[in-house]
């Protein structure tokens, strides 16, 4: 889905797609609930002025706030100035559990703040 950010995708773009079905009558909360149940991780790919594309955000969808709005937690963000990908300190517990359920180990130290990750090459 083309969107400016993970939040823009969840709050604007997907609800617009729902509105294309004239026979459907979904509330904002029901759309948010469906997104929360179906999407665990959002990967934001951005195009840079030189034409290159890079991952600029990896964001967890972590259920709903009391207000009915989706709870989004950035896990990794790309620093355009330093040209590095860095952890925010948020650990995606649900995603990690699902990965481990498939027998794959996850080193949780990658989620520590101030541990720069290598630049992701597109």
Model-predicted regions and their roles:
Residues 51-122:
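NTP-binding/hydrolysis catalytic cores, primarily Walker-type P-loop NTPases
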């Amino acid at each position: 889905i083309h969107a400016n950010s993970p939040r823009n995708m969840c709050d604007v773009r997907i609800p617009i797609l729902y509105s294309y079905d004239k026979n459907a009558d979904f509330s904002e909360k029901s759309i948010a609930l469906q997104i929360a149940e179906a999407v665990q991780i959002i990967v934001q790919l951005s195009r840079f002025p030189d034409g290159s594309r890079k991952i600029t955000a990896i964001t967890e969808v972590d259920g709903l706030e009391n207000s009915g709005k989706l709870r989004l937690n950035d896990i990794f963000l790309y620093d355009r100035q330093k040209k590095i990908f860095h952890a925010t300190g948020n650990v995606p517990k649900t995603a990690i559990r699902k990965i481990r359920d498939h027998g794959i180990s996850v080193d949780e130290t990658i989620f520590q703040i101030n541990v720069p990750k290598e630049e992701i090459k597109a």
